[in-house]
Amino acid sequence: MIWHTFFQPFIEFGFMRRALVVCLALSLSTTMLGVFLLLRRMSLMGDALSHAILPGVAVGYLLSGMSLLAMTLGGFIAGIVVALVAGWVSRRTPLKEDASFAGFYLGSLALGVTLVSLRGSSVDLLHLLFGSILAVDRDAALFVSGVASLTLLCIALCYRGLVSEAFDSAWLQVNHRRLPALLHGLFLALLVLNLVAGFQVLGTLMAVGVMMLPAVAARCWARTLPGILLLAAGMGALCAWLGLSLSWAISLPAGPAIVLTVSALFFVSLFFGTRSRLLVGWRTLMG
């Protein structure tokens, strides 16, 4: 039973192997970005940007159909533009950056759905919103793997700066005047790039789930930042494997099955995590 559910599909079927490789690559890169979003108290920014890329993806779709290059380029440009404009608005107005993102992403989501509806069918819209992980081809797998490798390399090279900017940006601003802006720009670019890569697999609505939920779950267990990063990546990879296996075994949509698996791990961590222990606190309160 265990062999047939969790191992045999990936040995026998090439599309399952490609889906697993892509999910593992995304788990390594997006979860680490999710941890840094958590440290910055900007957890909803990932959700906002995942919606913000939809108009660019839709424009690429209108111009070139289901072209990987066109939709990727359009989504990346749209995400960067929204991030820059939201940052500019937050500096020029009393609004904070997360509030600016909230305003822009709602309009972006509506615009993207409208653009796709001009040409596509409901099937095309569902593909863009929820992805089609089992239909990932070789080019998409290479693209996602390349994005994950680039992200891990950038995090390794800029780790100290990213940590300093997340915990004490004022100190970094005093000692290195231009560095915080450069690090923030790099972080946003990596965030948008990973969301665009995730859209190829899980769609714009589901991609952020793989980014944020393992990060939050890991925070309930680990005490140190390296521990949170490693645990989040491991949780993301484990849930990707379990989600794909369960989707195969009981005929569930693969993308939602993965996100549901991560959600289940999040709730377990919330109640039983050594840093959370919500259940123990609830029993103490009731007792």
Located regions from the model:
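Loop-to-helix entry region at the N-terminal start of transmembrane alpha-helices
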Residues: R18-V21, L125-L152
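Short loop segments and helix-boundary regions at transmembrane helix junctions
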Residues: V35-S50, L54-S122, A218-L230, S247-I250, ...
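Hydrophobic alpha-helical transmembrane segments
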Residues: L20-A25, T72-I77, A102-G103, A141-G146, ...
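Membrane-interface helix termini and inter-helical loops of multi-pass transporters
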Residues: I2-E12, S122-V136, S245-W248
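Membrane-interfacial amphipathic/re-entrant helices at transmembrane-helix boundaries
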Residues: M1-L28
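Transmembrane alpha-helical segments in multi-pass inner-membrane proteins
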Residues: V201, L205-P256
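Membrane-helix/interface signature in polytopic inner-membrane proteins
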Residues: L153-F187
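Cytosolic-side transmembrane-helix boundaries in multi-pass membrane proteins
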Residues: L252-G287
